[in-house]
UniProtKB/Swiss-Prot annotation:
It comes from Arabidopsis thaliana. Homooligomer. It is found in: Cytoplasm; Nucleus. The keyword Metal-binding does not apply. Keywords: Cytoplasm, Nucleus. Transmembrane segments: none annotated. May participate in cellular volume control by activation of a swelling-induced chloride conductance pathway. Pfam families: Voldacs. GO terms for biological process: cell volume homeostasis; chloride transport; spliceosomal snRNP assembly. This is Chloride conductance regulatory protein ICln.
Amino acid sequence: MVAGLRDFTLRTEDGSGKPVLDESNGEELMHVQTSVAVALGNRPIESPGTLYITSRKLIWLSDVDMAKGYAVDFLSISLHAVSRDPEAYSSPCIYTQIEVEEDEDDESDSESTEVLDLSKIREMRLVPSDSTQLETLFDVFCECAELNPEPVQEEEEESGHNWVFSADQMDVRGGDDDAEWQISQSPTSVIGHSNGDEGLNQPMLELQINDQRFEDAEEMVHESETKDH
């Protein structure tokens, strides 16, 4: 079952305003970033708060309203990316896509309605006041995402066809003519990481087949036919 985005108001009673973690089950605080505003779906950006990144989830707590806060498990985050494109959003931010439970009977878009249903929110943007911290946040996101791998379905294990692989497992010799694959960063302002099967709105990596090897093969066939005649 997908947990999705949810309310979070559990704060410690020592006056620090920090969130209560599930330490008994091994949850640890990994990073704290102050002065981070949040925008849910297409709704207006909210007043700044503090972002707490734990080994299990993201927690955003408002600095203005002590009774307001949001949380989402890393297992529910299908994609996170650094966005600096002003056409995509007005401020540099961490963009996230959140998995939600599909409800065929509910055709309304809760992201744009007055009544906020957090369980239907599919996108969340985290906007730090200091945009130079985006890379640090992205690195922490990646680290915590690796701590929460998506459970492997039994059918996938039995089928033996796992087509997921990393760039480190591929030949990335872009300068060699005989390289089978050439991997180049797509010329966009987004750096992305996907934790699931969701498609990216913009291509993060561009895989290109080096067609030179086919041209060489055609030349060899042509030379062979010439010698035979």
